[in-house]
UniProtKB/Swiss-Prot annotation:
Keyword set, alphabetical order: Acetylation, Angiogenesis, Cell junction, Cytoplasm, Growth regulation, Phosphoprotein, SH2 domain
Gene Ontology terms describing biological process: angiogenesis; cellular response to growth factor stimulus; epidermal growth factor receptor signaling pathway; insulin receptor signaling pathway; intracellular signal transduction
GO cellular component, one term: focal adhesion
Signal peptide: none
Source species, domain of life: Eukaryota
Summary of subunit composition and partner proteins: Interacts with CPNE3; this interaction may mediate the binding of CPNE3 with ERBB2. Interacts with the Trk receptors NTRK1, NTRK2 and NTRK3; in a phosphotyrosine-dependent manner. Interacts with the NPXY motif of tyrosine-phosphorylated IGF1R and INSR in vitro via the PID domain. Once activated, binds to GRB2. Interacts with tyrosine-phosphorylated CD3T and DDR2. Interacts with the N-terminal region of APS. Interacts with phosphorylated LRP1 and IRS4. Interacts with INPP5D/SHIP1 and INPPL1/SHIP2. Interacts with ALK, GAB2, GRB7 and KIT. Interacts with PTPN6/SHP (tyrosine phosphorylated).
UniProt name for this protein: SHC-transforming protein 1
Role played: Signaling adapter that couples activated growth factor receptors to signaling pathways. Participates in a signaling cascade initiated by activated KIT and KITLG/SCF. Participates in signaling downstream of the angiopoietin receptor TEK/TIE2, and plays a role in the regulation of endothelial cell migration and sprouting angiogenesis.
Span of domain SH2: 488-579
Matches recorded under Pfam families: PID, SH2
Reported modifications of this chain: Phosphorylated by activated epidermal growth factor receptor. Phosphorylated in response to KIT signaling. Tyrosine phosphorylated in response to FLT3 and FLT4 signaling and by ligand-activated ALK. Tyrosine phosphorylated by ligand-activated PDGFRB. Tyrosine phosphorylated by TEK/TIE2. May be tyrosine phosphorylated by activated PTK2/FAK1. Tyrosine phosphorylated by activated PTK2B/PYK2. Dephosphorylation by PTPN2 may regulate interaction with GRB2.
Amino acid sequence: MDLLPPKPKYNPLRNESLSSLEEGASGSTPPEELPSPSASSLGPILPPLPGDDSPTTLCSFFPRMSNLRLANPAGGRPGSKGEPGRAADDGEGIVGAAMPDSGPLPLLRDMNKLSGGGGRRTRVEGGQLGGEEWTRHGSFVNKPTRGWLHPNDKVMGPGVSYLVRYMGCVEVLQSMRALDFNTRTQVTREAISLVCEAVPGAKGATRRRKPCSRPLSSILGRSNLKFAGMPITLTVSTSSLNLMAADCKQIIANHHMQSISFASGGDPDTAEYVAYVAKDPVNQRACHILECPEGLAQDVISTIGQAFELRFKQYLRNPPKLVTPHDRMAGFDGSAWDEEEEEPPDHQYYNDFPGKEPPLGGVVDMRLREGAAPGAARSTAPSAQTPSHLGATLPVGQPVGGDPEVRKQMPPPPPCPGRELFDDPSYVNVQNLDKARQAVGGAGPPNPAVNGSAPRDLFDMRPFEDALRVPPPPQSVSMAEQLRGEPWFHGKLSRREAEALLQLNGDFLVRESTTTPGQYVLTGLQSGQPKHLLLVDPEGVVRTKDHRFESVSHLIGYHMDNHLPIISAGSELCLQQPVERKL
């Protein structure tokens, strides 16, 4: 009869680690030693696994900042002057393609796995992370020890440019804030698949796509393939993602960072694609698709992450004051697209698709530029402009009223060059701001999202708009005095009251916004539909997308006397008959 060996009695002085080694020597294999976890909540670092083709995902970074890791393949490569995958140190601006002999790039795990759920361990390419050093400086993205792909001053200045192909965009009908992370990733993948099927010559067009599930079909809308397949220069900076046609230098779109809510790569069959969701006046909320040369998609994602990182550090150096919800509505984004609070949100704006809500982000988008008449001015985009990038102004003292013949002889305002939107982009992380104020004993209204009474979205970029508020321009007083002498200026007037005064096509008037001081709105009737066009940008400059004017009177006189329509989003607004105010 076999007897089991007696178990050793418990001894509090027993060395458990030594006993484990002794037991392992009896035939069992000692457990593999795992690397110690970093200071953040991520698991240990693993080397890239062969055949692991999980998609690249860069999501907007708030408020779970310390949990995010970016795959940074080029961070582990020694940079050389002739390396095509990153900008050279001698000022080379365009990044052409990745190294031809480079293998498949390791990609980033899902955010759900990064947050600690599941048994799979997280890996981040590029060696050990400098997590402690990075967190000490208030960053929210852990980068490889060897650093980002590009110098910070280049990303904060002119930006890093990549030669890619613009494949079009797919309308997103629901707010990304209302979707979980997995659904957002599926939305971007499905948008990439839709575009690959629709555009001839797309890299992923040969594979058979699964039918779109019902939930995704209710989220994705129609596609816009106007510029599909066009080679473009993608410039990534702390201000925006700028898409410019490589041949004619036409700006296809300029999406500010605060209007971008999600960015991701494709699935294994579409690994060379980058998709990001942004808002603009033309496409509303849409998922824009970029096709990258082989091996370059990961660099594009990493550079976007670097731009977000730098913008957040700029906020830490210059945190804005805490604003009330009413001030937030009267700030940059609200004043630009929804200045009339009493109106329903689905009202037809001058630059809206029918039935769609006005966009919330400040964006410059010139998709319809080629359809404009020569010399025609475009509608104002709701973007702040720094004076050094607004283009040449008209000579001071140039007549803007009086004899129409004199105004007709005035040359058209010079076109504006490419613009930077903010001198010093600054960000708001409401949670960190409230904690900092409480630590120093500062007083301020509590944030309901921080206290848990309202859910906060991890990818919500809207808190940044607090940092973008600008005070009312001082010249608004003189502008108001000047407008009082114009017969077509009606003072403060609601949208409904203004539309009631329009009877014939070509009727127009200018009114002052009832909710935003210093903002003036051009209201006109075209093809039986009222149009509402903002005339003053957040810097207090009267401008259209291509030109700036000395005053509102100058803008009205220039377009009316020269019979030039204002073109925006495929529609024209002709200024023919001014509706004079009643005394």
